[in-house]
Amino acid sequence: MLRIVKKLGIILFVSSISINSFAKSMYDDVDSAPDYDSTPYYENEGSLVFKMRLGGVFSSAKQKGLPTPTSPQPVPVGEVAKNGYGGDASTTIFFNNYLATELSLGFNVLRTKYTSLAAVAHNYGVNNVKLGKNKPIYMIPATVTGQFHIAPYGGIRPYVGVGYHGSYMLTQATGLKIRNGHGLVGQIGVDFYAKDDTLINIDVRQFFLNPKLEYKPNLVGTKTVTSKVKLNPLIVSIGIGFTF
């Protein structure tokens, strides 16, 4: 009988230790579990987002439609402009969590290439022309874009868009005039929300733009030479935004 009591006592003692250890481990697990109530939750409080961006402009600037050269020994014309830089300001209007429209106004700079202008002057009758100081091509696009926000909740929110732009074109390069243009725009980007009302934006937009070029008589002789240039600039930007 005494042996049985001793065995029962040992079993109860070991059981109590085991239960106490299990309860302590459960308490520690609960205590170390994440507090979901305190996890940051990003949600738009307003239907407007204002953004300011700076970025690089990448363009091949290939010409097409040039007339037959008058020079007996023509040379390749090549690209009329180099890559450049620019920036824009935009306002995004949300209709719901997924659909929005972005209105933007930009200012971009493309550097003209001396070699291209000199080649045009050589091919169409004016050699040894003084090109003067290198003057850039300015592109000022006003753009309307419809956007679809793929994941509108959380701190990382990607989006895609398609729209249309009208671009005011300007240059003071010697003997060169560029006409205004317009075309489609494709867009992809992502917003990183730092706080409920502040975000970092990375944006990529492909502009389709083929404006008309006019080479003036002081560069090409007695008559104006016209062509089209396939600018189609790709603009990669980073910026900051605020929700309202």
Swiss-Prot record:
PANTHER family associated with the record: OUTER MEMBRANE PROTEIN W, PTHR36920
Superkingdom, natural source: Bacteria
Protein name stated in the entry: Putative outer membrane protein RF_0060
Gene3D superfamilies attached to this UniProt entry: 2.40.160.20
Keywords associated with the record: Cell outer membrane, Membrane, Signal, Transmembrane, Transmembrane beta strand
Protein family per UniProt: Belongs to the OmpW/AlkL family.
A GO cellular component entry from the record: cell outer membrane
Record's signal peptide: 1-23
Pfam families: OmpW
InterPro entries found in the cross-reference section: OMP/PagP_b-brl, OMPW
Organism annotation: Rickettsia felis (strain ATCC VR-1525 / URRWXCal2) (Rickettsia azadi)
Compartments where found: Cell outer membrane
GO biological process annotation, one example: transmembrane transport
